[in-house]
Amino acid sequence: MLHRTDSFWSRSVMKTRHLPVRHLATPLLLSLLAACGGGGANPSANLVSAPVNGTQAGGAGGNGSKPGVAPGTNGTGSAGSGQAGGHQPGSSNPAGNGSQPGAGTSGNHGGSSDSPRERVSWAGCKLNYFRGGPAVADRTGSDPNQTRQWYLTNTGSLPGFSTDGMVAGEDLRVQGAWDQGMRGEGIRIAVIDDALEVTHEDLRANVVAGSHNYRRLSPNAKTIAGHADYPMPCTEDNDHGTQVGGVIAARDGNGIGVSGVAPRAGLVGFNALANSLTEDALDALVRDIDRNHVYNNSWGAADIGHFFAPDNKAAFDSTLNDGLSKGRDGLGVIYTFAAGNGAFDGDYSSMDGTVSARGIVTVCATNAAGTRAPYSERGPNLTVCAPSADLSRTLGIEGAPTLPDVSTTALQNQYTDSFNGTSAATPMVSGVVALMLQANPKLTWRDVPLILARSARQVDAKSSGWRSHNSPIVEGQPGAYDTLRYHHDYGFGVVNADAAVKLSRNWQSVGGSSTQKQCGPFTTRVNAPIPEADAVATNPVRKSQAEAFRKALIEAGNRIDYNQAAANGLTSTVSVPESCQITHIEHIEVTLTASNADGSDEHPSAGDLHITLQSPLGSVSTLSVPHPCQLPTDNGSMQIGPCQGLQNYPFGVRRHLEEPVAQGSNRNWTLSATDRVAGETGRLKDWSITFYGR
């Protein structure tokens, strides 16, 4: 969902945040392809089947074998439907009125039936899915592929994999939450994505009524393509949502596959990305907010450097407000969003206005060694990270260790060891939130990020980027969760399921939407030039200089001290009036417009700018860093071009969580801006700041 209306910006809408490994050989295209890949790795690569007793479901053509099955895990399959993607009888046991996928049994791996089957996928799709067939007994037993799920329990090694650099304990600490009796029972999680294979053998026991199919015969058509209640994959590229669903809530103890973080939570699927329409995404974000608890969004704007505000921000904000104020009987639904995968090309999470809006839990990614995954975008909007793939070797980083990706469910009753990106980290946090809500169903949408931040686990402790703030949960009563630590790489740290559940149990709620205070917006008209200083490159860029220019800006962004205000530039201060009595900030929105030198148009190269916000406590949020941008050429390739979109752009800020608006008599919030690239200049026209909290 983007701010611009021309064809380039429109087609960049709603991209999944999983990095398709087959595309990563071209660094310049990484951020676009990472966002546009639609679902991930080559379907025939790194797929594994559960080593179970019995038969395996037939694959393409019904030959009984699965492409890319890991050595030693092949089963003997019975015939499938004889069509590519044919699904086995007995793969769904609908509940209720029989028209919706429901909480079914943990289905068989093979067998056949002569009973009539109803097609639930669109006839024009390459993959075919059916419902119906005989009910089968539940399987029991351990999940054989759980040993591959290092992100659940990291022992420092992985059987059958050649890995180095793994660090024991760099995981979700989920076993501690499970030991407290939390598995997600009674909590419903909606997967907003490209598709969800609700008939998957390791998902369908947790699929509950309420999924919705958004696929249409054409973008403007009113007719749904396929069954209205089955958001099924259409092609092999539509595997992203099914991988997300497995991370959240693959069924545990059924003798097959993997285990989700919340393995007894309910799942529904909304394939709202099928048509890349804003209206579908907005509808999905508030569909059944009276029944669903968590909405997982492993997607966002294309990771190509521009400032992408939501298309029709008023409608987007209104939609979120409905979910926050009306969902769960006024407690509010929980929205998780992926921070983005473009860091390797200089992209920055706060430049995607969709994932930094008020009420969103923005999720970054670490690796199995406990450091930032090199693609995971930094920002002042991050809440917590979760462990995901590293991909340093794939990205061409010399000397990097070989670290594992994420194991989860894949299409056609298969499993993959190659899920990655902030797409994989986000459903882990969604699963942890489900465990928290089971522990305390009265938690509001405001409570959840506070608990996540206070209970998060600090990683990369030797990094100089950490800053701390002490904010007692109960005044005068020191506690274990009083100190909040923030890092622009990691947000408040890595999500800690065990600690989050413990803190949730006796948490005193701060209330929902009706009790949250708002101060502002406080607007300042500046209309002054942004000075050039400490230039790292020069505009305009000749084609022969594009790669050197790109590298110079990325290196400049990496070298910045994110806890220092932008130096030698323009400063502008807002003094917050005494009528604003927020003592605990929960969210800040800074809206900013930069123009060209004469003020007649937008800034000619907004990626040149280093922009920061400093609080009365002295803490700094880096809103934007020098970075390159990409634009499409006539032949469809990408090239370096000027960064656009910094007009009335909303920066969402989480970094000042639990700080006061004022420190004694100091009520000044200072914006600083410096142009770090020589040659094209502009002005700061105006900016405003709005505070939310209590």
Q: How would you name each of these model-derived features?
A:
Residues D6-A25:
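Bacterial N-terminal signal peptides that target proteins for export
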Residues A41-S115:
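Ser/Thr-rich, Pro/Gly/Ala-heavy low-complexity intrinsically disordered linkers and tails
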